[in-house]
Amino acid sequence: MSWLFGINKGPKGEGAGPPPPLPPAQPGAEGGGDRGLGDRPAPKDKWSNFDPTGLERAAKAARELEHSRYAKDALNLAQMQEQTLQLEQQSKLKEYEAAVEQLKSEQIRAQAEERRKTLSEETRQHQARAQYQDKLARQRYEDQLKQQQLLNEENLRKQEESVQKQEAMRRATVEREMELRHKNEMLRVEAEARARAKAERENADIIREQIRLKAAEHRQTVLESIRTAGTLFGEGFRAFVTDWDKVTATVAGLTLLAVGVYSAKNATLVAGRFIEARLGKPSLVRETSRITVLEALRHPIQVSRRLLSRPQDALEGVVLSPSLEARVRDIAIATRNTKKNRSLYRNILMYGPPGTGKTLFAKKLALHSGMDYAIMTGGDVAPMGREGVTAMHKLFDWANTSRRGLLLFVDEADAFLRKRATEKISEDLRATLNAFLYRTGQHSNKFMLVLASNQPEQFDWAINDRINEMVHFDLPGQEERERLVRMYFDKYVLKPATEGKQRLKLAQFDYGRKCSEVARLTEGMSGREIAQLAVSWQATAYASEDGVLTEAMMDTRVQDAVQQHQQKMCWLKAEGPGRGDEPSPS
């Protein structure tokens, strides 16, 4: 029994205390007489560490228990302790069994997982094997196709070679046949020629006699015809001369015929010039508001609207600086009053950078004054060569036939109105310039001359003498650019976005602030460049997927326009000085 030796005792056991500590080691047990033998440790006995104290204490406790009155209780307590230990051992055994069962379930789960992995791996291997077999089958099929294609190509090549050989044999046969036929033909022709020559040699006398008879007969026939014709003409002329009435009638008829032909020719020329001057348009005129018969027949509604339209404001749609606007308004008022009073028109020179509104103001000036306008370019004169003088006279003749008065606008006038003394110009262009100077030597109440140029310093001195007023159109400032941006933004973006069924839409942002910002960024740009910028906004919106013009799109197009303007200024600067009134790089 374990409780006799003090082992596995419960915490509440009575009569048994904790085991006594081990006795201390005797100091003489380690040393003694053996220490002097070379300091080697002495061999230990197997019972040297045995402590008999526990046995003694157990025997003592057993004796006390036998004489104690609690011996039975102690025995019961020992049995209960043994039962408790057995229950604990059974619970541990159950735990061990549960652990074993859990381990078995884990093993089963691991085996199932391993089986699943094995199945998936087998499936994957099977799929890979199937794919590999399919790949091999495809390769075999492709190889078969290639072999079949090579075989077909080889058969086709053999067939082509066979056809070529047959064609060569047929060609050789035909050539041989033609050669033999040619030889036979030559032999036949040679035989016929020999036979004909032999027959002609034998019949030479007969042939010469036939030729002689035919020539004599032809000579006799010709002589008789001449005698007969001379007799007839002589008798007719004698009869005509002797009859003075016939002579007089013939002379009068020929005279009337000559007069009619000459009159018809000149009348046709005069009528053609009249029709061309009244109804046609000169070749030098590129654009005109003057109504022609052909235009009235083609567009009757537009012509009627133009006839019924009232005079417009000369500066409508034209954005200029305040000082320039006041000056050109005075010119427009003076021109309108000149037309009303049927006085002489003044000639005007408008110079400045391109795209500043010179052509637009000329059109507005004509419409405001109730006049017709005609636009020609100086570059069209030089290619006409010798026809330039005639075309120039036709232009001014056509201008003098206008009942409402004509504003003749010459764009890029420096192209042909150059200095005659220093510039190297052709004789034809010099003659055309002289014709222009002749027709503009005096003021007219039929037409008004307006010249536009970027380089007015190249004009001939006689041209400068014919100009009454010079107007300088400069690049727009900050305020003018903002007005231009707002006007073109409204024309090309706002109106298409709010009117009609167009695809253009406009995103939500501050339009006024954006127009002011664009005007600030476009410093140095002309009105035409700002109009092109607005058109590019419209095109960008049309090119987008949803047709919406956003603020970012506008900024992108503005940056592109500014870069393009700077590039143009770099090119202009590279050309060197002497460009007249070209815009300076900003």
UniProtKB/Swiss-Prot annotation:
Chain coiled-coil ranges: 86-219
Bias (Basic and acidic residues) ranges: 32-48, 111-125
Positions of the UniProt region annotated as S100B-binding: 290-305
Sites bearing N6-acetyllysine, chain numbering: 491
Superkingdom of origin organism: Eukaryota
Matches recorded under InterPro entries: AAA+_ATPase (IPR003593), ATAD3_N (IPR021911), ATPase_AAA_core (IPR003959), P-loop_NTPase (IPR027417)
Localisation: Mitochondrion inner membrane; Mitochondrion matrix, Mitochondrion nucleoid
Induction cue: Up-regulated by Angiotensin/AGT.
Spans within the Mitochondrial matrix topological domain: 265-586
CDD domains named in the record: RecA-like_ATAD3-like (cd19512)
EC number: 3.6.1.-
GO molecular function: ATP binding; ATP hydrolysis activity; identical protein binding; protein serine/threonine kinase inhibitor activity
Expression sites (tissue/organ): Overexpressed in lung adenocarcinomas (at protein level).
Region (Disordered): 1-55, 111-134
Impact after mutating residue 411 to Q: No effect on homooligomerization. Immediate fragmentation of the mitochondrial network
Membrane topology summary: Single-pass membrane protein
SUPFAM superfamilies: P-loop containing nucleoside triphosphate hydrolases
Enzyme class: hydrolase
Effect listed in the UniProt record for changing residue 293 to S: Loss of S100B-binding
Record keywords: Acetylation, ATP-binding, Coiled coil, Disease variant, Hydrolase, Membrane, Mitochondrion, Mitochondrion inner membrane, Mitochondrion nucleoid, Nucleotide-binding, Phosphoprotein, Transmembrane, Transmembrane helix
One of the GO biological process terms: mitochondrion organization
Domain description: The transmembrane domain and a C-terminal adjacent region contain all information necessary for mitochondrial targeting.
Task of the protein: Essential for mitochondrial network organization, mitochondrial metabolism and cell growth at organism and cellular level. May play an important role in mitochondrial protein synthesis. May also participate in mitochondrial DNA replication. May bind to mitochondrial DNA D-loops and contribute to nucleoid stability. Required for enhanced channeling of cholesterol for hormone-dependent steroidogenesis. Involved in mitochondrial-mediated antiviral innate immunity.
Noted disease: Harel-Yoon syndrome: A syndrome characterized by global developmental delay, hypotonia, intellectual disability, and axonal neuropathy. Some patients have optic atrophy and hypertrophic cardiomyopathy. HAYOS inheritance can be autosomal dominant or autosomal recessive.
Subunit structure: Can form homooligomers. Homodimer formation at the N-terminus may be regulated by ATP and is required for the interaction with the inner surface of the mitochondrial outer membrane and correct mitochondrial homeostasis. Interacts with components of the mitochondrial ribosome and with other proteins involved in mitochondrial RNA metabolism. May also interact with protein involved in lipid metabolism, including STARD9. May interact with FAM210A. Interacts with GADD45GIP1.
Protein name: ATPase family AAA domain-containing protein 3A
Organism of origin: Homo sapiens (Human)
Taxonomic lineage: Eukaryota, Metazoa, Chordata, Craniata, Vertebrata
